[in-house]
Amino acid sequence: MKVHLIRKETIEAYAEKNARSKSSFKVWLTVVKFANWQTPESIKETFGAADLLGNGTNRVVFDIGGNNYRMICKYAFGKNQVHLFVCWIGTHAQYDKLCKHNEQYTVNHY
């Protein structure tokens, strides 16, 4: 199923503010645009370094830019498309701070 990315402008705004990340997020956006996912495991097939968070959250963490950036998204597989909601974007170090408090399961900054 095609991916319906919700909050694409959030990714673009982050990339504009963090110029070093721009090309990496552009590549990620292009891959998602042409992705065809049937199950959560399909996400991992497309992005081998992605982590499905579990705990009933339907969240995935994407490693972007050679693991310099992390993006948490919530996914919902619908009848005809996959809805992907951007929940959080930051550096790997910022992500590690979230994880210390188990906030990766609930954070919603966008």
Q: PLM features: residue spans?
A:
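Basic, Lys/Arg-enriched alpha-helical interface segments
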Residues: M1-N68, A76-F85, H92-Y110
